[in-house]
């Protein structure tokens, strides 16, 4: 699967320590949190996951858990290029506590993370080799400093028979992404686990399917695509005629 995250965490204190102490999350408590964070959406319970896998659920599914002091939400819908565009009601829900957003996608080497304290943004970073630095707000955290200082330059292996080109960024976003995930949430996706890391394989998340009453769920999207194909009709084939103009054929 690669390193992919769409993760939102609310906490009253140190997230890694709170997750280390987390037991089984109450389903009713978690469902109440879901209704608060997804107002006006249809919410149906489904099979859950563990934290290590639940940070990147299938489309239309959210994996979540709520404990006293800490709440976790895994949702692809949180994967936004600019963390400052996180919906206001999600930021408002962090009043009096810390909010961490962590997004990562290994296919495009993209990383975005942000931290709010009591609803106030203190740090936001989003970057990828294709788009460069899209957002960089606030003072870097200590775990970032070696990267910005040039001590963690990207080590990219070129394809065979291709010349090596300089990596567009001073470091690899996914390497910083793993360090950010560990520092902010206590675990990693693909890095080497450390002794005091949170065991994300042992933390269960409840599953929920999210439906927009005014939008399109997976079934509606499939039907819409089928309808588009029917509207387009069968393929039409053309060849060049003797006069050099396109002439429609019955097929090939």
What is the role of each PLM region?
Residues 28-126:
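Short, intrinsically disordered low-complexity segments
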Residues 1-33, 247-252:
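Short, extreme N-terminal segment that most often corresponds to the first beta-strand
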Residues 14-16, 79, 130-131:
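Short loop/turn segments at secondary-structure transitions that flank enzyme active sites
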Residues 11-13, 75-76, 208:
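Structured loops at beta-to-helix junctions and adjacent beta-edge loops in soluble globular domains
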Residues 20, 24, 39, 95, ...:
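Generic surface-pattern signal
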Residues 16-20, 31, 35, 87-91, ...:
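Generic detector of well-ordered alpha-helical segments enriched in charged/polar residues
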């Amino acid at each position: 699967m690669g390193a992919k995250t769409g993760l939102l965490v609310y906490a009253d204190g140190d997230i890694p320590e709170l997750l280390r102490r987390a037991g089984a999350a109450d389903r009713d408590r978690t469902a109440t949190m879901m209704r608060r964070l997804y107002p006006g959406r249809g919410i149906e319970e489904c099979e859950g996951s563990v934290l290590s896998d639940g940070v990147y659920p299938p489309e239309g599914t959210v994996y979540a858990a709520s404990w006293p002091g800490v709440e976790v939400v895994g949702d692809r819908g949180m994967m936004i290029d600019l963390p400052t565009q996180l919906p206001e009601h999600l930021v408002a829900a962090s009043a009096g506590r810390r909010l961490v957003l962590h997004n990562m996608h290994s296919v495009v080497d993209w990383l975005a993370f942000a931290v709010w304290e009591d609803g106030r943004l203190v740090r936001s970073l989003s970057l990828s080799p294709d788009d460069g630095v899209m957002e960089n707000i606030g003072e870097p955290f200590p775990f970032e400093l070696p990267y910005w200082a040039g001590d963690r330059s990207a080590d990219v292996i070129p394809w065979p028979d291709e010349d090596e080109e300089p990596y567009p960024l001073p470091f690899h976003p996914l390497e910083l992404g793993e360090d950010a995930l560990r520092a902010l949430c206590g675990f990693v996706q693909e890095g080497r686990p450390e002794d005091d890391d949170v065991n994300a394989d042992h933390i269960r998340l409840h599953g929920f399917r999210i439906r927009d009453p005014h939008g399109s769920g997976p079934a509606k999207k499939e039907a819409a695509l089928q309808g588009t194909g029917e509207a387009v009709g069968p393929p039409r084939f053309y060849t060049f005629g003797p006069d050099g103009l396109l002439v429609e054929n019955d097929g090939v």
